[in-house]
């Protein structure tokens, strides 16, 4: 309907709440199977996780299994608080040890918490940056995203849809406010990640 040709389901993973990666993966599998039974058949759905960055998360056994299925991509959510160097260090430790490509989720949402210097550190990370459709409808966030585009940072687009009511997908907003090239670049990054496995 909105030009979407792939779904990447990334339920939140909070290490301090989970007993193990395996338990999380089992719950995720059951939820996905249940969802598929209730709705129309979705043929292009990939499972992953949105990993909350916590201290020492890089020491967690089997964390590499949270990468997006069929890719070397792994999605991280930074804490919504003042920036500290350990946050990027944890991401880099995981990606380096397991040869994964990190994606920093909804990079525009940290604007209220991070200074310009903090953002410089985040954007220096060897990572891909994910931007949600909502950023294209918020003046401050959209201005930030335009700078990322202008400076040719690697971006992937997302909806962060949780439902079809108050957290529904809104890709039409991206289509209205941006160049088609952004969408093509995002798709190319996702396609390339499948080829490097």
What are these regions (language model features)?
Residues 5-6, 100, 155:
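Short acidic/polar active-site loop segments enriched in Thr and Asp
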Residues 7-8, 129, 157:
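Hydrophobic residues within beta-strands of alpha/beta enzymes
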Residues 153-169:
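Short acidic/histidine-rich active-site segments
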Residues 171-197:
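Mid-to-C-terminal alpha-helical segments outside catalytic/metal-binding sites
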Residues 13-17, 52-54, 108-113, 136-139, ...:
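Active-site environment of divalent metal-dependent phosphoester hydrolases
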Residues 18-130:
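Extended substrate/RNA-proximal surfaces in nucleic-acid metabolism proteins
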Residues 1-7, 34-38:
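A short, N-terminal amphipathic alpha-helix
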Residues 5-12, 46-48:
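Short beta-strand segments at enzyme active-site cores
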